[in-house]
Amino acid sequence: MLHVRGLGLPGCLALAALASLVHSQHVFLAPQQALSLLQRVRRANSGFLEELRKGNLERECVEEQCSYEEAFEALESPQDTDVFWAKYTVCDSVRKPRETFMDCLEGRCAMDLGLNYHGNVSVTHTGIECQLWRSRYPHRPDINSTTHPGADLKENFCRNPDSSTSGPWCYTTDPTVRREECSIPVCGQEGRTTVKMTPRSRGSKENLSPPLGECLLERGRLYQGNLAVTTLGSPCLAWDSLPTKTLSKYQNFDPEVKLVQNFCRNPDRDEEGAWCFVAQQPGFEYCSLNYCDEAVGEENHDGDESIAGRTTDAEFHTFFDERTFGLGEADCGLRPLFEKKSLTDKTEKELLDSYIDGRIVEGWDAEKGIAPWQVMLFRKSPQELLCGASLISDRWVLTAAHCILYPPWDKNFTENDLLVRIGKHSRTRYERNVEKISMLEKIYIHPRYNWRENLDRDIALLKLKKPVPFSDYIHPVCLPDKQTVTSLLQAGYKGRVTGWGNLRETWTTNINEIQPSVLQVVNLPIVERPVCKASTRIRITDNMFCAGFKVNDTKRGDACEGDSGGPFVMKSPYNHRWYQMGIVSWGEGCDRNGKYGFYTHVFRLKRWMQKVIDQHR
């Protein structure tokens, strides 16, 4: 296989490709946009041509035919000569005209299998944007810069590192399509490409709100229509039927919402919208209606006005039924080794100060007991750390759905495949008399979890077989109410992420270089929603928020592989409790400039959690 190293990319084409993509929110590009990336840009002079001028190589090898020895005399390096000679021999058949020959040498077009191609096309022949070669989302590549160091696997540009007979290709950003070929111009054959461009027809993925007159406000709370079938096609049970009365006995329904026949309604102000009871487990399902976009939190207010100047009720109110939820909610978020002893951890003040001045802190080794709600989701066979998670009561654990079910990574775990380890500090060592190991009774994944597109509603509940006893190192975190979300989930305010994930993004085979020995902590600022949306071409929904450092920030930090499913928490300055605002969900690489970590918006899915938990009476 011929590997090409050290050749510059054509700058104009790079700018054209990136400019055409950066404003798009589509996974699938429009045909005109996709085809525009295939236009070749001519340059009067180039970095490669400058290299050729060294030692009259241009005259010897471009204007005339040269030998390997003549090229070596000019370049004076076996490695540089091998790189040049590999391209030179491939491109020898298109020496005329000179412009075509230079296109081939500089990798702006493909010859034969396209091993010479080093251009900036980053979309497949069907219009799917390419995945970054260094990223593991949505697909885990088996070809990367470590396995193929000479293949020039930069950004998400199409390449042919494995000598595919179809020519240059890439991993795609579509979770259902692992890899696909790209349409690359063929050298010396105007209008011909390595494979034909056949863009797919896909629906719009714009983040547009429906017109006000065509959508339901308040997530359908006042909906009075006659829809009586759920999104999954299940018939709704009548609200006055015996099974429904039993299921809703302890529900606190809004009296303004009229529960008529078996029509879909939203009597508990569920952020997911209207729903109804059904005959099968978990006993309820959601209905398909068109809701207006009404984001909760993440508004960018002045810190002094929103925190220091606001009178807020600091009294804590429980939300769940203790009979089904278990113990711990009344005392949640108060750490035994800190708040209960009137102590603070070493960066807590800076975290709280961010609500006013927005200072930034790097990651560090966690103090013991700093996150007593942290859970390790552990695979039984082979034994390995799978994900993070969080303890929300003595019976229930919260994690990301993709930790349980994600077909692109061959994940589809059952209760028998997993266990949870609670109270841990060390990543690998068994901590006798401190950690507790618990088996799972039941896994609940959100019925609208969307792994095929964007990991929307990336949330799962784990029911423990036995209640776990609390200790100095085992204690539940609080789940936020609307007031807490409105007060704290604002751009510039900082939350805390904990986990045993990789310390940095790398393809090294030496695991000890990148995996921490103990629990890690990092404080991250919440990012404005428009900035989040502009940072990616993956569709962002109201069930997500993003956090992380911007390009001009002096400090760094991010969640990384292995942190998934873990908590994003914030401390309330009113009642001094810790609330889980988010679940570590996904990101395009770790701590990359212009990229942020995305988190599941816990509050928006809290009513779903309540209804699932209430079935366990």
Curated annotation (Swiss-Prot):
Domain Kringle per the UniProt entry, residue ranges: 109-187, 215-292
Propeptide segments, given as residue ranges: 25-43
Entry annotation: catalytic residues: H402 (charge relay system), D458 (charge relay system), S564 (charge relay system)
Domain of life: Eukaryota
Residues modified as 4-carboxyglutamate: E50, E51, E58, E60, E63, E64, E69, E70, E73, E76
Signal peptide annotation: 1-24
Record-annotated Gla domain positions: 44-90
Regions crossing the membrane: none
GO biological process: acute-phase response; antimicrobial humoral immune response mediated by antimicrobial peptide; cell surface receptor signaling pathway; cellular response to mechanical stimulus; fibrinolysis; G protein-coupled receptor signaling pathway; ligand-gated ion channel signaling pathway; negative regulation of astrocyte differentiation
One MF term in the entry's GO annotations: serine-type endopeptidase activity
Function: Thrombin, which cleaves bonds after Arg and Lys, converts fibrinogen to fibrin and activates factors V, VII, VIII, XIII, and, in complex with thrombomodulin, protein C. Functions in blood homeostasis, inflammation and wound healing. Activates coagulation factor XI (F11); activation is promoted by the contact with negatively charged surfaces. Triggers the production of pro-inflammatory cytokines, such as MCP-1/CCL2 and IL8/CXCL8, in endothelial cells.
Protein name as annotated: Prothrombin
Organism: Rattus norvegicus (Rat)
Gene label: F2
